[in-house]
Amino acid sequence: MISHGLISAALFLCVGVLYDRVQSRLISSYGGIVNILPKLSLVFAIFMLGALGLPGTSGFVGEILILLGAFQKSFLVAILASIGIIFGAAYMLWLYKRVIFGKLEKIELKELKDLNFSEGIVLFSLAVLVLFFGFYPNLILDTAHISVEELIKNYEQAIILNQSMVK
């Protein structure tokens, strides 16, 4: 959930920066901005790849743990989740291609300014965290492990208590 929070917030910030500059929500209003906004294109790529679950990003850690758990419990659910991941990845790649690498058809896009200092600090800080937790996930997992063990213990006690009340 930490990874999802970082990546989702960062993607919304990237879209917000684009909207602030272009004032349009239509994908067709964009295209070919990689040469005009290289810093934004870079951080957008990092967050998009994190959302896809690319190894080396925090998104990979979350997705692989969820899929491994799903395969242990229900093969059908795991397959459905995997299909959802594939469709999500296809959409994200399509979106990135159209917005960032598409053909530059609108002359007014050439006047856009790349990230300012404060936008850059926020977005690059989030990018560093997404990459850092992708390579060092145990900083989060070890901390969460204690809480999860306690939650499981309480859940098991509640089940035992419930079963004893039913008898």
Please name every model-derived segment.
Residues M1:
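Short alpha-helical catalytic segment bearing the HExxH-like zincin motif
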Residues G5-G88, M92, L109-L129:
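Interfacial and helix-entry/exit segments of alpha-helical transmembrane bundles
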Residues L37-K39, L93-K167:
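Cytoplasmic/organellar membrane-interface segments at the starts of transmembrane helices
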